[in-house]
């Protein structure tokens, strides 16, 4: 059996006339010019770097920080209101679920849903957890860490999502 080996420089996901990143997770965000230029976008795909204007958090990717004093989850949920979000803690996990029904936008009808689950460190004080949504759509889940002599309770409970009027200023590491 003959197998054709192509250098990654010449690989194209759907052929030379289709952008290779149309099906990324940026649904409803629109396209940039380089998304529609197949020779620029798919020809250099293994070495391609996204525009500097799109940050990691713009892509819906969460950021988890755990330092000596607290545990923090930052998640971009700009397409959801606090009523669309459910945050609950069960045992050693925090579950964040977002869903909004089909609604009309500039391009037609769209519905979104996500479900994220994170393991909480064993020394997080589950009775003091908080969750807030900034004006720019950044969900911040915080939990202070307890001293080693104290015992953390492990039961299921919902964490209310409060709305902040100011944009998120992500705490520095």
Curated annotation (Swiss-Prot):
One of its GO terms (cellular component) is nucleus. The modification N6-acetyllysine is found at residue 99. The modification N-acetylmethionine is found at residue 1. The modification Phosphoserine is found at residues 45, 122. Pfam families: Crystallin (PF00525), HSP20 (PF00011). It is found in: Cytoplasm; Nucleus. GO terms for molecular function: metal ion binding; structural constituent of eye lens; unfolded protein binding. Residues 153-167 have a biased composition (Basic and acidic residues). Disulfide bonds join 131-142. Residues 149-173 are annotated as: Disordered. It comes from the Eukaryota. Belongs to the small heat shock protein (HSP20) family. Heteromer composed of three CRYAA and one CRYAB subunits. Inter-subunit bridging via zinc ions enhances stability, which is crucial as there is no protein turn over in the lens. Can also form homodimers and homotetramers (dimers of dimers) which serve as the building blocks of homooligomers. Within homooligomers, the zinc-binding motif is created from residues of 3 different molecules. His-100 and Glu-102 from one molecule are ligands of the zinc ion, and His-107 and His-154 residues from additional molecules complete the site with tetrahedral coordination geometry. Contributes to the transparency and refractive index of the lens. In its oxidized form (absence of intramolecular disulfide bond), acts as a chaperone, preventing aggregation of various proteins under a wide range of stress conditions. Required for the correct formation of lens intermediate filaments as part of a complex composed of BFSP1, BFSP2 and CRYAA. This is Alpha-crystallin A chain. It comes from Loxodonta africana (African elephant). The lineage of its organism: Eukaryota, Metazoa, Chordata, Craniata, Vertebrata.
């Amino acid at each position: 059996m003959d197998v054709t080996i192509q250098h990654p420089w010449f690989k194209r996901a759907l052929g030379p006339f289709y952008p290779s990143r149309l099906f990324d997770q940026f649904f409803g965000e629109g396209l940039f010019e380089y998304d529609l230029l197949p020779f620029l976008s798919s020809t250099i795909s293994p070495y391609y770097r996204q525009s500097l204007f799109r940050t990691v958090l713009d892509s819906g990717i969460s950021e988890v920080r755990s330092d000596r004093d607290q545990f923090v989850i930052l998640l971009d949920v700009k397409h959801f209101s606090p009523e669309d979000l459910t945050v609950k803690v069960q045992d050693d996990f925090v579950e964040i679920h977002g869903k909004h029904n089909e609604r009309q936008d500039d391009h037609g009808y769209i519905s979104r849903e996500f479900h994220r689950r994170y393991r909480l460190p064993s020394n997080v004080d589950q009775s003091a957890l908080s969750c807030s949504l900034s004006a720019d759509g950044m969900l911040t889940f915080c939990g202070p860490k307890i001293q080693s002599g104290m015992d953390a309770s492990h039961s299921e409970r919902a964490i209310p999502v409060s709305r902040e009027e100011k944009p998120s200023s992500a705490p520095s590491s």
